Amino acid sequence: MDDEIKDMEGQTPEEEIQGQDSHSDYKPADRFDASAVHHLSGMYKNWFLDYASYVILERAVPHIEDGLKPVQRRILHSMKRMDDGRYNKVANIVGHTMQFHPHGDASIGDALVQLGQKDLLIDTQGNWGNILTGDRAAAPRYIEARLSKFALETVFNPKTTEWQLSYDGRNKEPITLPVKFPLLLAQGAEGIAVGLSSKILPHNLNDICDAAIKYLRGEEFNIYPDFPTGGSIDDSKYNDGQ
């Protein structure tokens, strides 16, 4: 025992750690090795940019091509895979979507309820809450959903969809959905990312159709938000994002 203590007295902390029994092969970096030194300022800058871009692209901001956030796109993709014309329990849809979305069942359930309350892409059954009174939806095991006929007609087309591997590489998921309709304007979008946020107000379905026809004819058109719960807006600076 005394011999072991004497041997350890001349060791550096790194050598002491390496000499201890461990189940890990990890070896601490040598503080005298210049190549192993990481400056805090550089680490913060690089890692923060990685984190910010991930939140922007993978969590909070909708894609302009289909108007959907990743969780919304994965929900619709899962519902299309499950679709047999009948209603599915929301809890079942949430569980299926977790194959593609690695951020927990709560975020999937909340996003699904928000999509259902817009009454555009999802045909709902049960107590889905009320946007006029602020009442919450019932628990996922009590409410049901299926894709609406509008969604089946305008959102999906496997032949024109670009695919990528899911987060664990076990499944394929769409990069964006080939939506035939300006869904971003119809649903609106709101998300807070890192360094930026998005807030696009919803628009009236009939106004969007009229504007699309005029656009295809090369005619001028004006289109302004329309609030499902009512309200008024000063649109004098709307085109400037204010």
Enumerate the predicted regions with their spans.
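Catalytic phosphate-handling regions of large nucleic-acid enzymes and associated NTPases
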Residues: 1-241
